[in-house]
């Protein structure tokens, strides 16, 4: 069982990179975790709705290459379900007990996720109704996974 954190585009801010790496190390204490970064598409200055969909489609295809047929997929989308850290821990425990080969958290790029990712996802999760910088969202996902594992293992991180 592996937790995969799949995201579009490399983080450019050193602070975010350092925080993500720190949380990945902490997560790996409890459970194997793999960060997968797929390339984002260059975005032209003038973009039509059709071109935007083509960009998201190409990024989605790269994401889907890293997801196995029986993996449990959580898509991070603003329209997703907003839950507490305790509920994430409970859900994570249920997903672990269900013996999925992998649990995949998918974070889209600056244009969001393509519809085919929404359709493939088993669960739609929202961090908030607010919009966050891509790097900050990735840090928050990693932190919440670590917090959930800490809750499940009676760690001292969550009080």
From Swiss-Prot:
The keyword Iron does not apply. CDD domains: RlmH-like. InterPro entries: Alpha/beta_knot_MTases (IPR029028), RlmH-like (IPR003742), tRNA_m1G_MTases_N (IPR029026). Signal peptide: none annotated. It is an enzyme of class 2 (transferase). SUPFAM superfamilies: alpha/beta knot. S-adenosyl-L-methionine binds at residues 76, 108, 127-132. GO terms for molecular function: rRNA (pseudouridine-N3-)-methyltransferase activity. Its EC number is 2.1.1.177. The keyword S-adenosyl-L-methionine applies. It is found in: Cytoplasm. It catalyses: pseudouridine(1915) in 23S rRNA + S-adenosyl-L-methionine = N(3)-methylpseudouridine(1915) in 23S rRNA + S-adenosyl-L-homocysteine + H(+). GO terms for cellular component: cytoplasm. Gene3D superfamilies: 3.40.1280.10. Homodimer. NCBIfam families: PRK00103.1-3. Specifically methylates the pseudouridine at position 1915 (m3Psi1915) in 23S rRNA. Belongs to the RNA methyltransferase RlmH family. This is Ribosomal RNA large subunit methyltransferase H. It comes from Ureaplasma urealyticum serovar 10 (strain ATCC 33699 / Western). The lineage of its organism: Bacteria, Bacillati, Mycoplasmatota, Mycoplasmoidales, Mycoplasmoidaceae.
